[in-house]
Amino acid sequence: MTANSPLQRIGQEKGIAMGSQELQRKLGFWAVLAIAVGTTVGSDIFVSVGEVAKAAGTPWLTVLAFVIGGLIVIPQMCVYAELSTAYPENGADYVYLKNAGSRPLAFLSGWASFWANDAPSLSIMALAIVSNLGFLTPIDPLLGKFIAAGLIIAFMLLHLRSVEGGAAFQTLITIAKIIPLTIVIGLGIFWFKAENFAAPTTTAIGATGSFMALLAGISATSWSYTGMASICYMTGEIKNPGKTMPRALIGSCLLVLVLYTLLALVISGLMPFDKLANSETPISDALTWIPALGSTAGIFVAITAMIVILGSLSSCVMYQPRLEYAMAKDNLFFKCFGHVHPKYNTPDVSIILQGALGIFFIFVSDLTSLLGYFTLVMCFKNTLTFGSIIWCRKRDDYKPLWRTPAFGLMTTLAIASSLILVASTFVWAPIPGLICAVIVIATGLPAYAFWAKRSRQLNALS
């Protein structure tokens, strides 16, 4: 049976088990949308407005940068939507690169994600929650690490016991994180000062010109818009993926675009632009200009940040283990990661082991900071994924349930915008980034050779 045979496609679409113990389709549109939005709206927005303002140089270019930054993500989501409906199974980039014809490249993408991105991200977010909690009450550093570990364990148990229960929580926490941001927007509109938009431009405009300043601002928004494609990790558990995936991917992009644009608009109107451009905590600083909040702004932002990051942490604990599950089902990862709990119908071992690795990184935070240099590899992986659709479309068995409109233009924009992020990441840390790429290849290829050989042996016996 081919990877995308008619019988298997029917099984994938309807959630029929193709073998023993498969994950079932239990997630509807609203749960999927909540996961996409909840993953994307994270701690980045609490600092990115200031970074974008500094790069853009004027209030209007700051707002425009968020608009364009969100719009250029739409082509990327269109590519993901088509690929996810062509291969409605768990695994995201790994699955798409594999079906594009490169199992080694697919394995390397999953290998790098597991060790250098997924588990470390759990520790980073858990520690960020504790850091914001420390703003409210002093916390001993060691105790803080145990609290962070406890958060990961709590979400492990939640998502291990029920995918529906985890999705319900994710929906609630996503609503909870949007409410305070909506309050900020409402207060910002009420206390908006138009004269802040008429303030003199910063030196960035005189040095580089408006167009280059706008490009710099757009680049600074890039990380704020990452996370929507997380739902592609769980496509195999989503009901009616042919309709749900495009709606959730593109819909989440539009929702986040509107939210971020309004936040950028009101924050730029609340405080003098020169102060915004030099602020490391722009939302907190902007709220101090609201008489109704004053000195309580910091507390409000700290609580909001904890809710926001809690939602992102929960989402990551939920979707990330599906990648290793997919690799294990292909006999290209540790077999235990492919285990499905007979009662809860979740990839229990994958959830537990990834959470355990995340807890390990909490107690070796110096190592976690070094893993940030693998960002270049992860960005390049995304570029390859967008390019994989070109090769997938050449396959005779490629029959997506939804196709990207204006395919050539959308694919070009998706690849180009991703390459811009690769370039900016390379400029940030060129040598460490290249070293990390070598590490991924040097460790990943032998690991792939081992599992590929073992997979062939298992196939020969079956």
For each feature predicted by the language model, list its residue ranges.
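Alpha-helical transmembrane segments of multipass membrane proteins
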Residues: 70, 111, 132, 136, ...
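Helix-loop-helix junctions that connect adjacent transmembrane segments
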Residues: 18-24, 59, 63, 142-143, ...
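Hydrophobic transmembrane alpha-helices that form the core helical bundles
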Residues: 48-54, 74-152, 157-160, 306-326, ...
